[in-house]
Amino acid sequence: VLDVVGVGATRFRMDTVSKIILRCHPTVIKGNASEIQALYSHQIAMQGVDSLLNTSEVEVQAKALAKHLSCIIVATGAIDIITNGENVVLVHEGHPLMGKVTAMGCVATGIIGAFLAVNSNPLEASVHAMKAMGIAGERAASHSRGNGTMMINFLDELCNLHAYD
C-alpha cells in the first residue's frame, strides 16, 4: 500500500512517488481526494489540480488512474472512493470528526494493508478496510468530546469490531 501523503505539495514528492510507482507497482495507492487529483494530473492529465472538485469528478479521476496504473485507488474523504479502474465502490461510513484527527489517514493505510494480508482480492480488501474504519469512526464519535478522545475511542472501537459488523 502506497500512501501518497502530500504528493502535490512539492516536485520532489511527486517525483519520488512516481519513481516508487514505476519500480514497485503498488497493489493499492491511497490518498485523500486532493492527493489523488494531484497524482492523476501528473500521471494522466499533466495539468493543474483543482482541489475543489466534487466526488463525481474525483471518482472519474480515481477510476482513470487505477486503470492507467493497474492498481486499486483509494481516495479518502467524506465519501471514500475505491476503484480498480472498472468497478467503483463508494463508502459512506465515517464521521466528520475523523478528518480532524491527525494520522487517521496513516491508520487507514495500515488497516488496508492488514486486510490485504487476509483477502487476496485487493478491491474487496480495500472496501472492507475502509468500511471498518468508517464504522469504528462512527461508533467512536458517538461518545467522543473532541479530537483527543476521538482517537482513543476510535482505537477501542476498531479493536472491538467483529466480522458481522
List the model feature ranges, each with a label.
Residues 135-165:
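Charged C-terminal helix
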Residues 89-102:
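Short pre-catalytic strand/loop immediately N-terminal to key active-site residues, enriched for Gly-Thr
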Residues 5-7, 34:
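Active-site beta-loop-alpha junctions enriched in small/polar residues
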